[in-house]
Structure formats: C-alpha cells, structure tokens
Amino acid sequence: MQSLITYIALVFSLFVSSAIGLHLEVPALPNPQPVCIRDFVQENQMVVVNIKTDGSKGDGQRLDLKVTDSLGNEYRNKKDVVGHANVAFTSQHNAAIDICLTNYLDNKWSKHQQTVRSVELDIESGAAARDWNALQASEKLKPVEVELKRIESITEEIVEELRYLKAREERMRDTNESTNSRVKWFSIVVIASLVGFGVWQIQYLRHYFKVKHII
C-alpha cells in the first residue's frame, strides 16, 4: 500500500510539483550580465531555491542572487553568496519567476586570467518545496499518512493549475472572438465604402460624359 501511494505521488509530481537541478559556470567580469533561470509558478505557491557555490570571500569575486517575477515584483536580493545559501518565498501571482546570478570581478583581479564561480542550483516549488519530514515529526504522522497528505497537496495544485488554464483559455477565446468581430465589421465597412465609391464614380462619369455630349 505504501509503495503504491509513493508511486502515485511521484506520478502526480511529474505534472505539478517541479524540482529543477542545474549546474552553472558563472563568469566573473567587471561589468557582468546576469545569468537567469526562468520557471513558472502559481499564485501563493511556495518556492525554495538552494544554492551551492565554490570560491570564498576575498577571492576577487562577488556573486549576487536576485529573484523577481515577470510582473516586476522582487522576492529576494542576496549579496555575496558563498558556500551554501537557501532562499524561500511564496509567489504573489501566477507568473514566471527569474532567478538571476551576477558575478562581479574585483578591479584588482581584472588583469588575471578569467575566473568563474561554479554554482549548483536547485529550484523546488509546490509540494516538492515543503519539508515533509518536519511535518511528519511535528504532527507525529505515519509514513503512509505523510504520503497521503503529500498526494492531497499535489492534487490541490493540479486542480488550481487546471482552473488557471481554463480561465486563461476563456480569456484567450474572448479575445479571439472580440478580434474576429472587429475584423468582420471592419471588412463590412471597407466593402460598403468601396461599393459606395464605385457607385459615386459611375454617376460622376455619366454626368461628365453627358456634359461633354459624349452620351
């Protein structure tokens, strides 16, 4: 039974909960450009970013971490990340989040060979970001009960995701219908204008020819 529940939870996790593991080499430059990772999260969804870097303070590099979303909200801005760092926040909107790393090179090191920071980045969101071991310990739950709660959490996220997709589809459909209606009426106006202009031109030419006694 427990193995079945675990299997179901893993299947659900493929659809909703996301856990991204990346290895990055971030070059250090005097005027660096940020290296960003983008992921989409739902509103009120918990996100945990785990960072592990090499290097040390005073090695001529300063690695900064900044987390924002596509709507301009800033969640975290951490300076001089060294070793292990953990950032957790709750998203405010259904939006894409950008996790950006910027590696600054100290001026006195600028004449040396190019240096980089090796970064291991883990991004977890939704049910994958929750500490289920802590929940099990605090509520004294059995492993099966923890898996059931995890499945319940994942199921709720699936429902919210489907609601969001449905609402988005309805908005896009309304936009398409409105656009089609405007194009239809614009086409009718253009055709009516062309017909009216053609009739006026025919009448004008008939009058012109009559004046000139051509017809």
Curated annotation (Swiss-Prot):
Residues 1-21 form the signal peptide. Residues 22-184 are lumenal. InterPro entries: Emp24-like (IPR015720), GOLD_dom (IPR009038). Residues 206-215 are cytoplasmic. One of its GO terms (cellular component) is endoplasmic reticulum membrane. Keywords: Endoplasmic reticulum, ER-Golgi transport, Golgi apparatus, Membrane, Protein transport, Signal, Transmembrane, Transmembrane helix, Transport. It comes from the Eukaryota. Pfam families: EMP24_GP25L. Constituent of COPII-coated endoplasmic reticulum-derived transport vesicles. Required for efficient transport of a subset of secretory proteins to the Golgi. Facilitates retrograde transport from the Golgi to the endoplasmic reticulum. Belongs to the EMP24/GP25L family. This is Endoplasmic reticulum vesicle protein 25. It comes from Candida albicans (strain SC5314 / ATCC MYA-2876) (Yeast).
